[in-house]
Amino acid sequence: MRLEYCAFSRNAFDNRIRRLLAHELLVRREIPNMNRGVVYSISRAGASEMIGKGEFFSGSMDKGEPSSVHVQHALELNDIHIALKRTGVLVRWTPESDIRSRNEFTEIGYVKDYDAVVAVRLDGHEHRFALEYERTPKAKARYQAIRKRIETETEFRHFLYLVPNYDLLLFLVRAFEGCPRTVYFGLRKDFLAETLSLSVQSNHSPVSTAFRAVLTAGSLRPNGRGARSAQAALFT
């Protein structure tokens, strides 16, 4: 909240949370595997209220509560977002919910519901990349389908997968072997400590490099790709 300049007082924040809970716009959940941690999420009534105010939404209002695994993924992805926000280089963070809405309801979507599409400003230039936080591995057949989608992506050149451990990193490198698009892989803990300067490995080379150098290498594609770009900016 402080990073978004929405609240600076803890008491004011707590009072706001209590009011939202009282009006059943938020749901309070205790997560057993989080050492008595508590998570607040938007309720169905809260989601309905936000839809009425023009927020992006894709999916059923009748879905049940998310599993603890999904909650943990969301919290750890949020840590990644906050770490990048603190650097001051983040321009836009488009979350999966907005991406899914765009993909399902418009003609200017991406090829995949990424965990986030990130825009950062480095050395006076804006760079975008797709971000995936792969907390647990998928079946190999799933990665074959993902590879085919990534091969057709035209909105950006860079793809970053963050993972919790090195074994999973190597598994993903192998899963993306043969993909003509370069996909980069790094450790989540390194990103939290170094953000864009973290060391990454690609599916095309065993040599590690800083992800910041990957983003800034070469020239950016010029802006102004016609109506498609103009419309896309509305969503990012």
Language model segments and positions:
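Nuclease-adjacent, charged terminal/linker segments that flank catalytic cores
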Residues: 1-64, 233-236
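Hydrophobic, Leu/Ile/Phe/Ala-enriched alpha-helical segments that form helix-helix packing faces
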Residues: 5, 17, 21, 80-88, ...
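Active-site metal-binding core of divalent-cation-utilizing nuclease and nuclease-like domains
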Residues: 29-30, 69-72, 83-129, 135-139
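A short, highly charged nucleic-acid-interacting micro-segment common to nuclease
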Residues: 61-78
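Non-catalytic C-terminal interaction segments of nucleic acid-processing enzymes
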Residues: 124, 137-145, 151-236
